[in-house]
Curated annotation (Swiss-Prot):
Organism (species): Tityus discrepans
Keywords: Amidation, Disulfide bond, Ion channel impairing toxin, Neurotoxin, Secreted, Signal, Toxin, Voltage-gated sodium channel impairing toxin
Secreted found in the keyword field: yes
Subcellular location: Secreted
GO biological process, one term: defense response
Protein name: Toxin Td7
Residue numbers of Lysine amide PTMs: K71
NADP listed as a keyword: no
Signal peptide coordinates: 1-7
Similarity-based family: Belongs to the long (4 C-C) scorpion toxin superfamily. Sodium channel inhibitor family. Beta subfamily.
Length: 73
C-alpha cells in the first residue's frame, strides 16, 4: 500500500508574515532552517529570503495573494 505525501516549495515566513531574511546570515542558514521544518533543501534566493524545497504541506510559505508582511496583525 502506497502513501502519498504532499510537498511544496516556497519562501519561509515568520509569525509576522514576512519572508525569512538571509542577507546577513551564514551560508548554511536557509538549508538548516528548511531541514528543521522537514524540507529537503534550501538556499538564500536573490530576493534575500530563504527558499525551501519539498516542505511538508503543513508548513506555511509566502504567497503574494495572502501576504500580510508589513500590514500589522
Amino acid at each position: 500500500i502506497g502513501m502519498a505525501v504532499e510537498c511544496k516549495d516556497g519562501y519561509l515566513v515568520g509569525a509576522d508574515g514576512c519572508k525569512y531574511g538571509c542577507f546577513t546570515r551564514p551560508g548554511h542558514f536557509c538549508a538548516s532552517e528548511c531541514s528543521l521544518l522537514k524540507g529537503k533543501d534550501g538556499y538564500c534566493y536573490a530576493w534575500l529570503a530563504c527558499y525551501c524545497y519539498n516542505l511538508p504541506d503543513s508548513v506555511p510559505v509566502w504567497d503574494s495573494a495572502t501576504n500580510r508582511c508589513g500590514k500589522g496583525k
